[in-house]
Amino acid sequence: MFKEFREFAMRGNVIDLAVGVVIGAAFGSIVKSLVDDIIMPPIGLLIGKVNFADLFITLKAGATPGPYATVAAAKAAGAVTMNVGQFINSVVSFVLIAFSVFLLVKVVNRLYQKKDAAAPAPATRDCPFCATAIPLAATRCPHCTSQVPPAD
């Protein structure tokens, strides 16, 4: 049983999948850092919040009455919050990852795309008398019954 598992695990597809998962996790952390540390701070400055992740709505005050400066302070007080900023960060991260994967798949598909084969020779020709499509080997048109010269 161990031998079968080892053979399964060493097949190319499983190893490729494992490498893809590891690289995907690393890529996800890079995109998360890009969103949290590079993209969202300028947007946060534009809307008046320096830390965009701390944009939240207090649904129910905790033991200590609000307002709370951060999500962490609200959670420490036992408040129930709707963390809008963290959700927006996650959406932006998802969009960036999805767009990056789209571009990657597009490039890979372009690399592996087979070149268009030469168009196959036509199997029919037009009858010179009635313009109906007839097989190349036909010597008489089935539509108008005219005799047609053999195909070249």
From Swiss-Prot:
GO terms for cellular component: plasma membrane. The keyword Transmembrane helix applies. PANTHER family: LARGE-CONDUCTANCE MECHANOSENSITIVE CHANNEL (PTHR30266:SF2), MECHANOSENSITIVE CHANNEL MSCL (PTHR30266). Belongs to the MscL family. Channel that opens in response to stretch forces in the membrane lipid bilayer. May participate in the regulation of osmotic pressure changes within the cell. GO terms for molecular function: mechanosensitive monoatomic ion channel activity. Coiled coil: none annotated. This is Large-conductance mechanosensitive channel. Its main location: membrane. PROSITE patterns: MSCL (PS01327). The chain crosses the membrane at residues 14-34, 84-104.
